[in-house]
Amino acid sequence: MDRKSNVSRTTSETDIQIEMNLDGKGKYNISTGVNFFNHMLEAFSKHSMIDLVVDAKGDIEIDDHHTIEDVGILLGEAFRQAIGDKRGIKRMADATVPMDESVAKVAIDISGRSYCNMEFDFTNEKIGDMTSEIVVHFFESFVSSAKLNIYGVSKGANDHHQAEAVFKAFAKSLKEAIKIEHDEIPSTKGVL
């Protein structure tokens, strides 16, 4: 089974191309114009073992919203295409990741339905060059396209550490949920 995708999206605000290999080695080439977001996507790729190429150009002279939102939408679409009919996947997984004084927990269900519940304890308006509030919106955008459920929570005193712990917990839970365990659709309905 070839679990790869190559997707693109062009709007008046952004121009994005994404390549994804779910059965990769955690190799990445990320360029979004938002340095802290690049760092988060690199951590996601490395810890999920998903090979990821993201080339995004957006209207970051306005702010980071359109670029990060559209990367989330397209990343979700790339995931949905790569995962296919979900035959044999573990489907549900969770991970807890500490980073210094911070800790994050993320649980995922690749259910075919979209739901996002993320609670972060950010105290600053920005984390590096990325607005703090866009972190939740990135996950909402990803989930709406990927068609999965995600619950995440973080606590800590350092926003950088919290965000990084969240992206790593997301990566580790997704890595586990996409593992092939058998040859069946993991649902009593027979479809996801």
Swiss-Prot record:
The gene is hisB. It is found in: Cytoplasm. This is Imidazoleglycerol-phosphate dehydratase. It is an enzyme of class 4 (lyase). PROSITE patterns: IGP_DEHYDRATASE_1 (PS00954), IGP_DEHYDRATASE_2 (PS00955). CDD domains: IGPD. It comes from Methanobrevibacter smithii (strain ATCC 35061 / DSM 861 / OCM 144 / PS). GO terms for cellular component: cytoplasm. The lineage of its organism: Archaea, Methanobacteriati, Methanobacteriota, Methanomada group, Methanobacteria. Keywords: Amino-acid biosynthesis, Cytoplasm, Histidine biosynthesis, Lyase. GO terms for biological process: L-histidine biosynthetic process. Its EC number is 4.2.1.19. InterPro entries: IGPD_sf, ImidazoleglycerolP_deHydtase, ImidazoleglycerP_deHydtase_CS, Ribosomal_Su5_D2-typ_SF.
